[in-house]
Structures are given as C-alpha cells and as structure tokens.
UniProtKB/Swiss-Prot annotation:
Specifically methylates the N3 position of the uracil ring of uridine 1498 (m3U1498) in 16S rRNA. Acts on the fully assembled 30S ribosomal subunit. It comes from the Bacteria. The lineage of its organism: Bacteria, Pseudomonadati, Campylobacterota, Epsilonproteobacteria, Campylobacterales. This is Ribosomal RNA small subunit methyltransferase E. GO terms for biological process: rRNA base methylation. It catalyses: uridine(1498) in 16S rRNA + S-adenosyl-L-methionine = N(3)-methyluridine(1498) in 16S rRNA + S-adenosyl-L-homocysteine + H(+). The keyword Transferase applies. PANTHER family: 16S RRNA (URACIL(1498)-N(3))-METHYLTRANSFERASE, RIBOSOMAL RNA SMALL SUBUNIT METHYLTRANSFERASE E. It is an enzyme of class 2 (transferase). Belongs to the RNA methyltransferase RsmE family. It comes from Helicobacter pylori (strain ATCC 700392 / 26695).
C-alpha cells in the first residue's frame, strides 16, 4: 500500500474509523509510532500524519507534513466502453487504473446486455475499487466515470472520438487517445451504429483473434502509453 485514502486528507486532525480503522489497525496492525501517508485523490498532495491517539474503535491523526507529488500516466487516455457484464467491468477497473486511463465512459450499445443496470450504488462500488487500486499502485487522482443511456448520447458528447471495430486501419500508438476510443460489446456494433460512425476514424486491433471487450480495453490502454 503506497498511501491511505481519506476524503478529508489535508485537515490538521483526522479521525480514522470504520472499515479503514479495521484494515489499518487490525489487519495491518499499524503501530502508534509509525507515520501514515494519506491522499484525498483530488489535489495531488501527499499528506503525512502522526498518531495522536489509537483507541479500540478509532484513531486520531495529526498532520505533520504535505508535499505535492502527482503520480499519473504521462498520456491521457479516454475509453468509451459499451456496457458489458458488471462483474467484468469490476475486474478490469484496477488494470485500467494502473495503466493510467484518465476517464472511462460507459454506454448502452444496441447489443449491450440491458439487464446490467448501472445505478448510483454500482458507480459508488466502482469508485471504491478504484480507490483501493490507487492505494496499491500510488496513482494520485481517481479515474473519471460516467454513463450514457445509448450510443447516440455518447457520440454527441464526444464528437472526435475514434472507434475500435473489426475493420479499419491498425490502431497506431500515435492515435489521439485523449479524445476517446469507442469499444463495442461482445457482438460488435449494429448496422445502424456503424452508420453513425461514417465520419469517424475507424481502427482495428492487429490480431486475427477476436478479443473480448475487456481485453480490448486493456490493449488500447497499454498502446496509449507507448
């Protein structure tokens, strides 16, 4: 663990309780003499705290230092992924986070599984996964998440995003990944959707094998940092 997340990190005094307390003082057995580095994942600062008090249910920390230390990928990557099974989205979130993806937009394509509903509770769960990933890899800012109800909405929001499909030019490392790369569901895009893409740059992955959507995401995120 590179640091501990706390939404109020930078305050002079912090109270650690609940799940964070259990993890730090019961699982990791942090001692009162040790210092802790914390982040709020918003301002890029690493805050150092000393223990003022440790009780059976909470701990009080006192701020003793702060330094700007941004840990992010050198290139920004925006993936626009059609909704797949929730469990598969959850599996790839840590990988995308570690590979420096700056934003993940989810949208319901024509062939998306409509029974997979992404509500506020699901987004909060996704964010929790990303927070744990940041703590492990050291990333200093959270990946942005958003959801669109259909393909047209996603295209309207990102008019310069390119498309990953079965046909097109080989995806180059020089592509503008910050403008967005649209990745379809397992069954690909419908014909009406392909009609929407006529004015877009179309790329393909240089493999003869058909990749699952989550594999395509990891591939694109990796190429973007080359």
């Amino acid at each position: 663990m590179r640091f501990v997340y706390h939404p109020l990190a930078k305050e002079p005094v912090l109270k650690i309780e609940g799940e964070s307390y259990t993890h730090l003082y019961r699982s990791r057995r942090v001692k009162s003499a040790s210092r802790l580095d914390l982040r709020n994942l918003k301002d890029g600062f690493l805050y150092t705290y000393e223990h003022a008090e440790i009780t059976k249910k909470h701990a009080l920390l006192k701020l003793v230092g702060a330094r700007l230390l941004e840990v992010m990928a050198s290139k920004k990557t925006h993936l626009i992924l059609s909704v797949i099974e929730i469990k598969n989205i959850e599996k790839i979130l840590p990988f995308l986070n570690q590979l420096g993806v700056s934003k993940l937009s989810l949208f319901y394509a024509d062939f998306s599984q409509r029974n997979e509903k992404i509500d506020i509770a699901k987004l909060e769960r996704f964010q929790k996964i990303l927070i744990h990933s940041c703590e492990q890899c050291g990333r200093s800012a959270l990946m942005e998440l958003e959801v669109f109800s259909n393909t047209k909405e996603a295209l309207k929001a990102y008019p310069k995003a390119s498309v990953l499909d079965f046909k097109g030019e080989t995806l180059p490392a020089s592509a503008d990944f910050e403008k967005g790369v649209i990745i379809g569901p397992e069954g690909g895009f419908s014909e009406p959707e392909r009609g929407y893409f006529k004015e877009r740059e179309i790329y393909r992955i240089p493999l003869d094998m058909v990749l699952k959507s989550e594999s395509a995401c990891v591939f694109v995120a990796s190429i973007a940092q080359v």
